[in-house]
């Protein structure tokens, strides 16, 4: 991707502001379904006219519905299952310390689909590329899609829930894994706070690093952002800091981070598509 310009930065700042308002008015249940749809729905609202027209031309369904397609084809295309994540290991500080697997991963799959969408290939291939891009940008903003292979991205790290917290979250299970917490339970809790009229305090670290977060512009950068979140003791993923019980205090502390990741996913997805379709339009000019 091209280096950021001041116009790019201002554009993304505007998108983040609008995206925040959009997210606060959205119902939120699970990143693997509802959150993917919301990320793409909000990204679509941020597209320019050229990009919106191209999305409508390529797709045979709404953009938000298109963004869950990649999960729905796992059973018929099992070779794509590894494309939804990138494995790391304890002690890793940057995705550059890992090796892309031969079977593919979220970063290499996204890069491939970006190339396809930006090409003059068949409409069907470009349609699927667009659906993959919408989904993978979301996956690469969920920290536990760039987590340890040894515990399947937090799927084998379990926490128990109190009956009170089960009721707040509308969760029947008495025991959940860390991946599920970040896939959807934190978002449910954020909606609970909003419905209760409580404000969600922004993390000071997020405020302090807002400009640097926005300037990180490649899928590898997004992965490094996730790794930084996972390496934060407050996330509770590092072995010395893991807890046996999911608490309301944890959800309250982590909700601003999870929601910020979703807003960034929408904003970056919109910027990416605006750039891709603008480049194609320019190339097609006589």
Language-model features: locations:
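Intrinsic disorder/low-complexity segments
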Residues: 3-4, 22, 271
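Bacterial N-terminal signal peptides that target proteins for export
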Residues: 2-16
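N-terminal, motif-rich segments that launch catalysis or mediate targeting to/interaction with membranes
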Residues: 29-136, 143-286
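Cleavable N-terminal signal peptides
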Residues: 17-18, 28
């Amino acid at each position: 991707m091209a280096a950021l310009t001041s116009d790019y930065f201002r554009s993304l700042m505007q998108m983040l502001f609008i995206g925040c308002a959009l997210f606060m008015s959205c119902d939120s249940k699970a990143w693997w379904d509802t959150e993917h749809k919301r990320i793409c729905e909000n990204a679509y609202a941020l597209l320019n006219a050229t990009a919106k027209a191209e999305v409508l031309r390529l797709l045979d369904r709404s953009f938000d519905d298109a963004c869950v397609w990649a999960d729905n084809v796992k059973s018929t295309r099992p070779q794509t299952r590894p494309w939804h994540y990138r494995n790391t290991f304890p002690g890793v500080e940057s995705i550059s310390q890992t090796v892309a697997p031969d079977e593919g991963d979220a970063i290499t799959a996204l890069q491939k689909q970006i190339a396809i969408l930006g090409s003059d290939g068949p409409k069907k291939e470009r349609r699927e590329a667009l659906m993959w891009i919408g989904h993978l940008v979301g996956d690469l903003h969920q920290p536990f899609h760039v987590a340890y292979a040894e515990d399947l991205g937090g799927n084998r790290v379990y926490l128990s829930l109190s009956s009170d917290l089960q009721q707040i979250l509308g969760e029947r299970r008495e025991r959940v894994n860390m991946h599920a917490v970040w896939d959807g339970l934190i978002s449910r809790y954020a909606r609970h706070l909003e419905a209760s009229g409580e404000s969600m305090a922004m993390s000071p670290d997020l405020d302090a690093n807002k400009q640097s977060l926005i300037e990180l512009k490649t899928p590898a950068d997004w992965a490094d952002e996730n790794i930084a979140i996972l390496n934060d003791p407050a996330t509770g993923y590092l072995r010395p800091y893991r807890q046996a019980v999911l608490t309301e205090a944890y959800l309250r502390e982590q909700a601003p981070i999870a929601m910020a990741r979703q807003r960034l996913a929408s904003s970056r997805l919109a910027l990416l598509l605006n750039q891709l379709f603008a480049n194609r339009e320019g190339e097609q000019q006589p």
